[in-house]
Amino acid sequence: MSYQYVNVVTINKVAVIEFNYGRKLNALSKVFIDDLMQALSDLNRPEIRCIILRAPSGSKVFSAGHDIHELPSGGRDPLSYDDPLRQITRMIQKFPKPIISMVEGSVWGGAFEMIMSSDLIIAASTSTFSMTPVNLGVPYNLVGIHNLTRDAGFHIVKELIFTASPITAQRALAVGILNHVVEVEELEDFTLQMAHHISEKAPLAIAVIKEELRVLGEAHTMNSDEFERIQGMRRAVYDSEDYQEGMNAFLEKRKPNFVGH
């Protein structure tokens, strides 16, 4: 099949999905995510054993994260259950084949959560990673926070979110976010070699173990009162002047003036 915003190439038992949304810096807009999800669905075939997600070679930006133009104005949850980011992270996590994120360039905001939802992350040494919701006044949701803390740990996630500052690939490797960091000229060969190696293993066993790991990773307890309390806190944020100020400042390309209400 052909797609507008991604390109798909199969190499033996490995499928490579390359982003093709450069004019928007591979932002996670609905049209892009719809194409990506359709490509994954089409690749859920027995002869495909492993998937690689990548930006085009030489990319300065792997993905800019959320498409800010698609975030709702005040009064609506910017990260609801059917948000494109929520949809693609669920699909990656539940997909029955290993998915490797091959990262070249900078990873911003929601795209960081997306790659964290994949099974392995292999990055070029020049890559950087940042979580930026506080630059926009966006109240990240519980599922997204859980996805991040499950793999990166609370203190690292707090630093990433509270500062919104990028970290290097070397530091991301040191704190356990990445599996491997290689020089950019070696990235494609290294990742393909890993994917081909995985593709020769028992696919049914891999599928069930991936699902077991997902279920174990999501095993947590929160009572309904706590959930409603957190949702109320989030609602106060996306109803706030700060949320609207963050959106306006981004679109107007200026520094936001957050006042705390």
From Swiss-Prot:
It comes from the Bacteria. Its EC number is 4.1.1.-. InterPro entries: ClpP/crotonase-like_dom_sf, Enoyl-CoA_hyd/isom_CS, Enoyl-CoA_hydra/iso, Enoyl-CoA_hydra_C. SUPFAM superfamilies: ClpP/crotonase. It catalyses: (R)-methylmalonyl-CoA + H(+) = propanoyl-CoA + CO2. It is an enzyme of class 4 (lyase). One of its GO terms (biological process) is fatty acid beta-oxidation. The keyword Electron transport does not apply. Keywords: Lyase. The keyword Lyase applies. Substrate binds at A64, G65, H66, D67, I68, G110, T132, K253. One of its GO terms (molecular function) is methyl/ethyl malonyl-CoA decarboxylase activity. Belongs to the enoyl-CoA hydratase/isomerase family. Catalyzes the decarboxylation of (R)-methylmalonyl-CoA to propionyl-CoA. Could be part of a pathway that converts succinate to propanoate. Dimer of homotrimers. This is Methylmalonyl-CoA decarboxylase.
